[in-house]
From Swiss-Prot:
Keyword flag Calcium: no
A Pfam family per the record: Coatomer_b_Cpla
Name the record gives this protein: Coatomer subunit beta
Source taxon at top rank: Eukaryota
Length: 953
């Protein structure tokens, strides 16, 4: 710390355009001015002293003319003045004038006004001169007996601070405060006194607690919090004391203060692993979540429950509380509900899954009865996914869940309906006994489906799993009902012509007969080429989709019709019925092809859809055994393989999670005997208070030992050269929302450098919080300068600047050393994250910013390149490992990450290895990045480009 910093620890901005007052004018105002003028003058004196001015001539003036005043504002300002003014001579001896000031302190400590007494006591806590405090000790002791609690609690603080700094001034402080604590009634005074005993004489604090341990519940919350802290520290240092105080912690779980309950529950978990203790703490957490209105509090406490679940023995206890945890679903916040459902799903077992499903079904029904809202739709999706997972893990529950969920296939919210469809598809494949039920329910809701995407999926399921004549006939009936009158073109033209009034039937051009590809005649007029606007709600669903130009559903329908027709032929032996059914299926396909080629739809049919429908027509016309196997066996096997791979992937990830959580004990691990263990080694748990303090200070200890590159030295950036007059290097410490630059500045010359200033500026979404203050560097001296930079979003930022200084005694202009740029790494703010394929596709469609990066590397292996990109970008690969295994010369993978600011980043890697260039040919291709903000997309692209260049060196 420099000499300037030693005195000037607070900087107050002074307007540059104002003239600084002279010492003479200030002295005149302090001597002859009224109270208002003296107040203003005293403020100016304080600011000048804080900014480094000495003003020794004003000390006696203030003692003579300002100190005797009884004005409260002046007394407040005087306390600040006495705190900052130099009180000693250069050789360290107390100034003679301070004896007069000491007498003024004593009078204020005996002042009838309790505020003046209390504020003086608070001021005495900041004094570091024992000679000033010694004469005041009797007055400070007397304040412990004052009638007002404000004076008493500040007297306790003053005694504690003096005892800690100068124990010889009041050696009996612990005994004095203990006696005071026994007789005190005010909660804040008791809290301060008890806090002092904890730090000054812990044994006395424990003795006091032992005498009143049964009355702890009646204490104020501020004292209860201190008691919890004491019990934790004592039991952490000396585990044998746990039995003595654990009952007190149990009692504090019933406190009226949420803060006390939270701390008591956390302490109880660290002190005891008994099932009763864990259950009591968990129950306390659940009550807090339900009763607290702040969603942030709910999420914090939910995180504590999740931490409890990570311990295998605690998890078994929490499984009995699943139904209590589900009470949290009454909270309207989506994030809280999401975390609650995930926790309940992790804890559910065969004992309580039935009750869980009943509650979730009720919640699903509730979402129908509330006003539609974006969060309601998302909550419904969460419930569907949770029920889906329950049914897969506990197949017996599927029969209860399916009827409720099938109703949502006709929901207006396509996302929720898609989740239901995914669940139904998996259930009908896995559970053979449920197929008749699912097909029956699917046929019931089929006509009410509003989304073309859901309609396609439902068609596929019906075509794949209808195995009886009756079901096949029912599917055909539903398709005919959904398609309406056929042929579609003729019926639509008639319908439109019939809806027109006689005076509106004006033919723009001559009516002509056209021969279609099928060899039939189609009448076309101006009416069919420009249709009038009309209501479309009365159209059957499938007909509406086709007229809107969505012929992809027609291709799906053709496949379904082919499957059920081939299956019908195998079930029914009568040739006439076989031919009739096949002819009906072919007629439907033909009429759709006819519609697609006409001008009635909003968009014409695509060539791909024409090819698909034509192929199905050909299959039905030939009915070969090979095509029969492909349509009725191979398709189902493909689904089976996909679901098996998905299940295997989930099991593998669960296994990895459980392996992380399970702490295995090795055969050669040492056995700990309590009687033979030193006190400081007794508890294996870390001190939670110390950890929370470190976290608050931004000193969270990361596991850096395993990776030497993650050490602090790796984050040191050289800012100037070794030959520059001033050498500078910076350690870049990245916190969540800000960056701290710790800059080492070294004077490499033989001159004294005055007004040495670090001037910084930023590019990107960075903001310099405050300008570093100038300093003076002696020859070959060094100093550390800290600068804070605020970060607002995930974007590559650059910090640049220079160091300017004056050389002592030189008449030249200011000297300047330009600093190297500091690049802020986007990777410090990006974390791997997961999302479903549907969510990925939805975000991909919504995000408007795309950055396409061309692959330019010397890596020759596709998998190696993908792993390199994952490591460089901190993203997670969503594509299953099995889909990436093997070698076929090309690879496609989806990557996802989320920033600490809640921004999503998507990437699609599409790479190949050109075989014609030989085995040593590098990987080629491109990476497409999508994000909501331009900065995120560009920054991630820059990072990938940079990492590729490093690889190719």
């Amino acid at each position: 710390m420099t000499a300037a910093e030693n005195v000037c620890y607070t900087l107050i901005n002074v307007p540059m355009d104002s003239e600084p007052p002279s010492e003479i004018s200030l002295k005149n105002d302090l001597e002859k001015g009224d109270v208002k003028l003296k107040t203003e003058a005293l403020k100016k004196v304080i600011i000048m002293i804080l900014n480094g001015e000495k003003l020794p001539g004003l000390l006696m003036t203030i003692i003579r003319f300002v100190l005797p005043l009884q004005d409260h504002t002046i007394k407040k300002l005087l306390l600040v003045f006495w705190e900052i003014v130099p009180k000693t001579t250069p050789d360290g001896r107390l100034l003679q004038e301070m004896i007069l000031v000491c007498d003024a302190y004593r009078k204020d400590l005996q002042h009838p006004n309790e505020f003046i007494r209390g504020s003086t006591l608070r001021f005495l806590c900041k004094l570091k001169e024992a000679e000033l405090l010694e004469p005041l000790m009797p007055a400070i002791r007397a304040c412990l007996e004052h009638r007002h609690s404000y004076v008493r609690r500040n007297a306790v603080l003053a005694i504690y601070t003096i005892y800690r700094n100068f124990e010889h001034l009041i050696p009996d402080a612990p005994e004095l405060i203990h006696d005071f604590l026994v007789n005190e009634k005010d909660a804040s005074c008791k809290r301060n006194a008890f806090m002092m005993l904890i730090h000054a004489d812990q044994d006395r604090a424990l003795d006091y607690l032992s005498t009143c341990i049964d009355q702890v519940q009646t204490f104020g919350d501020i004292l209860q919090l201190v008691i919890v802290e004491l019990i934790y520290k004592v039991c952490h240092a000396n585990p044998s004391e746990r039995a003595r105080f654990i009952r007190c912690i149990y009692n504090l779980l019933q406190s009226s203060s949420p803060a006390v309950k939270y701390e008591a529950a956390g302490t109880l978990v660290t002190l005891s692993s008994a099932p009763t203790a864990i259950k009591a703490a968990a129950q306390c957490y659940i009550d807090l979540i339900i009763k607290e209105s702040d969603n942030n509090v709910k999420l914090i406490v939910l995180d504590r429950l999740v931490e409890l679940k990570e311990h295998p023995s605690h998890e078994r206890v929490l499984q009995d509380l699943v139904m209590d945890i589900l009470r949290v679903l009454s909270t309207p916040d989506l994030e809280v509900r999401k975390k609650t459902l995930q926790l309940a799903l992790d804890l559910v077992s065969s004992r309580n899954v039935e009750e869980l499903v009943i509650v979730l079904k009720k919640e699903v029904i509730k979402t129908n009865n509330v006003t539609e809202h974006e969060d309601t739709d998302k909550y419904r999706q969460l419930l569907v996914r949770t029920l889906h997972s329950c049914s897969v893990r506990f197949p017996d529950m599927a029969a209860n869940v399916i009827p409720v969920l099938m109703e949502f296939l006709s929901d207006n919210n396509e996302a929720a309906a898609a989740d239901v469809l995914e669940f139904v598809r998996e259930a009908i494949q896995r559970f053979d006994n449920l197929r008749p039920l699912i097909v029956e329910k699917m046929l019931e809701v089929f006509h009410a489906i509003k989304s073309v995407k859901i309609y396609r999926g439902a068609l596929w399921i019906l075509g794949e799993y209808c195995s009886t004549k009756e079901d096949i006939q029912s599917v055909m009936t539903e398709v005919r009902r959904s398609l309406g009158e056929i042929p579609i073109v003729e019926s639509e033209i008639k319908k439109e012509a019939g809806e027109l009034k006689p005076e509106e039937e004006v033919t723009v051009g001559p009516v002509q007969k056209l021969v279609t590809e099928m060899g039939t005649y189609a009448t076309q007029s101006a009416l069919s080429s420009s249709r009038p606007t009309k209501k479309e709600e009365d159209r059957p669903p499938l007909r509406g989709f086709l007229l809107d130009g969505d012929f992809f559903v027609a291709a799906s329908l053709a496949t379904t019709l082919t499957k059920i027709a081939l299956r019908y032929v195998s079930l029914v032996q009568e040739k006439k019925k076989q031919n009739s059914f096949i002819a009906e299926a072919m007629l439907l396909m033909a009429t759709i092809l006819h519609l697609g080629k006409s001008s009635l739809p909003k968009k014409p049919i695509t060539d791909d859809d024409v090819d698909r429908i034509s192929l199905c027509l050909k299959v039905l016309s030939e009915c070969s055994p090979l095509m029969n196997d492909i349509f009725n066996k191979e398709c189902r096997q493909s689904l089976s393989h996909m679901l098996s791979a998905k299940l295997e992937e989930e099991k593998l990830s669960q296994k990895k999670e459980s392996e992380k959580r399970n702490v295995t004990v090795q055969p050669d691990d040492p056995i700990s005997f309590m009687q033979l263990t030193a006190k400081n080694e007794m508890s294996s748990k870390e001190d939670q208070f110390q950890l929370s303090l470190l976290a608050a200070m931004g000193n969270t200890q990361r596991k850096e030992a395993a990776d030497p590159l993650a050490s602090k030295l790796n984050k040191v950036t050289q800012l100037t050269g070794f030959s520059d007059p001033v050498y500078a290097e910076a350690y870049v410490h990245v916190n969540q929302y800000d960056i701290v630059l710790d800059v080492l500045v070294v004077n490499q010359t033989s001159d004294t450098l005055q007004n040495c200033t670090l001037e910084l500026a930023t590019l990107g979404d960075l903001k310099l919080v405050e300008k570093p203050s100038p300093l003076t560097l002696a020859p070959h001296d060094f100093a550390n300068i800290k600068a804070n930079v605020k970060v607002a979003s995930t974007e590559n930022g650059i910090i640049f600047g220079n160091i300017v200084y004056d050389v002592s005694g030189a008449a030249s202009d200011r000297n300047c050393v330009v600093l190297s740029d500091i690049h802020i790494d986007i990777m410090d703010y990006i974390q791997p994250a997961s999302c479903t394929d549907a969510e990925f596709r939805q975000m991909w469609a919504e995000f408007e910013w795309e950055n396409k990066v061309t692959v330019n590397t010397n890596i020759i292996d596709l998998n190696e390149y993908l792993q390199h990109i994952l490591k460089s970008t901190n993203m997670k690969c969503l594509t299953p490992e099995k889909a990436l295994s093997g070698y076929c010369g090309f690879m496609a993978a989806n990557l996802y990450a989320r920033s600490i600011f809640g921004e999503d980043a998507l990437a699609n890697v599409s790479i190949e290895k050109p075989i014609h260039l030989g085995p040593e040919a590098p990987v080629t291709g491109h990476i497409r990045i999508r994000a909501k903000s331009q900065g995120m997309a560009l920054s991630l692209g820059d990072k990938i480009n940079l990492s590729q260049k490093k690889t190719s060196l």
